[in-house]
Amino acid sequence: MQTWQLPEHIADVLPTNARQLESAREQLLALFRVHGYELVQPPLMEYAHSLLTHIDAGLSLKTILVTDRLSGRQLGIRADITPQVARIDAHLLSANQGINRLCYAGPVLHAQPDGLLNMREPLQAGAEMYGFADIRGDIELIDLMLKSMKIADMGKVLLSLGHIGIFRALSDAAHLDAGQSATLLALMQDKDTGAVEAQVKAWKLDGMWAKAFSLLPRLYGGREVLSDARGRLPDLSAVGGALGELQAVCDAFPDCEIHIDLSELRVDNYHTGLLYAAYAADFHDAVARGGRYDGLGGYFGRARPATGFSFDLRSFIGRLPAIERQPAVLVDAEDAEAAREAVEALREQGQCVVIDYGIGHNVSEELAGRLKKTDGVWQVVKR
């Protein structure tokens, strides 16, 4: 193996893209800030039992574990920042009984990629709201998610909606146990209608519930899906409430193209209600995903309503505007000491000044000039 090789699905970010990413990160955090979201920076690594909540068993497959040489305890390198933010809200910010609006932008590390085209070191950015159960909170986060997409040239963005509350209401009414629910969840995630029908038949479910479960994978499309679902799904209060929340989101974004999929349920995840995602042309998967995950903080001692979204900012590379490098001022190496005061004055003004050692450099081809002493004064002389 060559010493310069990197692990699979791991890559360097070189200067041109690094400038784009840092600029996008700054714009994103500024956007979050003006909407009231405070920046938090959880550690990259912490005790594994804090990262691997019982709510999301699938997270353990993504988390890289190591032994702490100081304590001998097992540490985990974070694969998702949301559980860390839930811990912060539940423990470190517990004095606030009202709403906590929090945001972040930092690297995570995956033991295995989410897909063949995914990286194992995403730059996860997101915003989360804790302490507000109303659908208006979800609408606020969806609005912020869609605004976040505008920092890159995404073109037309499709908003995809789902609601795991419908499936759970049907599961409870049909008296499915945890194993049966997990089996149906997996089948629905695969959109395997035939397998769903065969499974509920094998369980000999009551006809009404068997029909409802078989119907869910077929309930997808535009806004009209909601009226179709109201007329065909069992009349349960929880189902009606979930459909009402989906309708409220549709009404809040009248000009947005919306796709609804009532079998989009996200297996092995911590979401509990409304699910939302943003899709853009030429992306093989959702650009951003979010949803409601009430109770996640209960693992850390304070269960609260919560909703939020996140995405991999590195996936935006190729859609971000070019960030030109500032033209540099050169100063000859032999003049550097004598011109130190002038050089530092220029740098304090934000001007890039590079010492020219006469062997080439990686600064911009377009130079702002060269620092020369003219009539006893150091001045930038244009070429």
Swiss-Prot record:
Pathway participation: Amino-acid biosynthesis; L-histidine biosynthesis; L-histidine from 5-phospho-alpha-D-ribose 1-diphosphate: step 1/9
InterPro entries attached to this UniProt entry: aa-tRNA-synth_II/BPL/LPL, HisRS-like_core, HisRS/HisZ, HisZ
Source superkingdom: Bacteria
Gene3D superfamilies, per the entry: Bira Bifunctional Protein, Domain 2
Keyword Ligase: no
Listed Pfam families: tRNA-synt_His
Gene Ontology cellular component annotations, sorted alphabetically: cytoplasm
Keywords, ordered alphabetically: Amino-acid biosynthesis, Cytoplasm, Histidine biosynthesis
Keyword Cytoplasm: yes
GO biological process: histidyl-tRNA aminoacylation; L-histidine biosynthetic process
Function according to Swiss-Prot or TrEMBL: Required for the first step of histidine biosynthesis. May allow the feedback regulation of ATP phosphoribosyltransferase activity by histidine.
Subunit structure of this chain's protein: Heteromultimer composed of HisG and HisZ subunits.
Family designation: Belongs to the class-II aminoacyl-tRNA synthetase family. HisZ subfamily.
Other observations noted: This function is generally fulfilled by the C-terminal part of HisG, which is missing in some bacteria such as this one.
Protein name: ATP phosphoribosyltransferase regulatory subunit
Organism per entry: Neisseria meningitidis serogroup C (strain 053442)
Gene designation per UniProt: hisZ
